[in-house]
Amino acid sequence: MVLEYFAIEIDLRTAGNFVHNITLTNPKEANGAVLYYLAIGDQADDHLRTRLLLVDHLLKEPTFSALRTKEQLGYVVQSMMWYRSSALGFVIRIQSERHPAYVEKRIETFLESYRAEIAGMNIEEFKKQRKGLIDKQRQRLENLNEEASRFWYHIESGYYDFTRRALFLHFQ
């Protein structure tokens, strides 16, 4: 399998829906992929980044459960915060045999339904989820690989604030 990496430059200062289609070089390839990116703001905004970390925590399991397990959209289903340069975003990535337009629609439907679920969450459940995230952030790294991965992620993002984790705990 040959993976191709490419970069697309889009001005995210204006709102919009941007789709970039790529023709596969192998016409027999049944899989497609969707990288659904939501631009959130400037990653230097500590409060915004902290809130997005909570959203990421709230969405991770339901995204996999709904889109991978229940809808069986694809083998690869991931959701995550996304840091690049100064941009802060949220990504849902799905590799699927289904048409990308269909996958995109299912992602949007899921986000709308889960938005309502978060809005209707009672305060006790919200506090429980928040505590779960705080506990997760307080966990010590288990090995050198985890620590290297964390540092490397800061380097790749172009935002060299290696104290983010401690800052998150300050904003709790």
Residue ranges, per PLM feature:
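Mature, solvent-exposed C-terminal subdomains and processed small-chain segments of exported/organellar
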Residues: 1-91, 95-172
